[in-house]
Amino acid sequence: MGSFPFLLPFAELEVGQHLYWQLGNIRIHGQVFMTSWLLIGALLTLVVVGTKKMERDPKGVQNLLEFLWDYIRDLARTQIGEKVYRDWMPFIGTLFLFIFVSNWGGALVPWRLIRLPSGELGAPTADINTTVALALLVSLSYFYAGLSNKGLRYFEYYVHPTPIMLPFKIVEDFTKPLSLSFRLFGNILADELVVAVLVFLVPLVLPVPVMFLGLFTSAIQALIFATLAAYYIGEAVEEHH
C-alpha cells in the first residue's frame, strides 16, 4: 500500500468498534445516530426541493419523487389490497426510502474520511440494532393492522385453516422479525467488508465492479424489506373464509 497512501482511510476495518453515547443508564451507538440523521436530512432536503415548485409536467427531482410515489403505491396496493393500502403507504414508503438511502449512503459516501475517537461511520443498516428496530416496527405494524381492522377476530388467523397451525404461527411471529433483521444486516455488512478488504488488497481495479454489484444488492434488499413488510400487513388484514 506504499504506492497508494491516499487509499488507507478507505481500507481500514473496525468490525465491532463503536462510538458510544451515554444517555442516563443507556449506551447508544453514536455513529449510527450521526449517519442516520445525516441521511434523513439529505432525504428531507430532496423532498423539499422536489415539492417546492410543483409543475404539471414534472421534471428533475419532482419527476423522481413522482416515480417513487407511483412505485410505492403500486407495491402497497399489490401486497396489502385495495381496501386499506392508502393507510399504509407512508409507512411502507418510509421504510423503503430509509433503507435504500442508508444502504446506498454506506456504499457511496466516503464516511471513513471522517475520523472518530472510536469506531467509524457507515451504513446505519450495517448495525444490527438498526435492522432489529426496523423489523420490530414491522411486527408491531402488522399486529396493529390486524387488530384495528378485525378486532379480536384477528386471532382467528392463528387457527386458520386448522387449529393444528397454532404453534407454527406463533413461532412464525418470532421468525419474521429475525429473518427481516438478519437478512438486511448480513447483506449490508458483508458488502461493506468485502469492498473494504478488496480496497486493501487490490486498490484500483477489482473493488469498482464489486461496488456496483453492492449498489444493486443494496437496492434489492430495500425492496425485499418493504415488500415483505407490506405482505405481512396485507396478510394481517386479509379476511379468511
From Swiss-Prot:
Keywords: ATP synthesis, CF(0), Hydrogen ion transport, Ion transport, Membrane, Thylakoid, Transmembrane, Transmembrane helix, Transport. One of its GO terms (molecular function) is proton-transporting ATP synthase activity, rotational mechanism. One of its GO terms (cellular component) is plasma membrane-derived thylakoid membrane. InterPro entries: ATP_syn_F0_a_bact/chloroplast, ATP_synth_F0_asu, ATP_synth_F0_asu_AS, F0_ATP_A_sf. The chain crosses the membrane at residues 30-50, 91-111, 128-148, 193-213, 214-234. The keyword Membrane applies. It is a multi-pass membrane protein. PANTHER family: ATP SYNTHASE SUBUNIT A, CHLOROPLASTIC. Key component of the proton channel; it plays a direct role in the translocation of protons across the membrane. F-type ATPases have 2 components, CF(1) - the catalytic core - and CF(0) - the membrane proton channel. CF(1) has five subunits: alpha(3), beta(3), gamma(1), delta(1), epsilon(1). CF(0) has four main subunits: a, b, b' and c. Belongs to the ATPase A chain family. This is ATP synthase subunit a. It comes from Prochlorococcus marinus (strain MIT 9211). The gene is atpB.
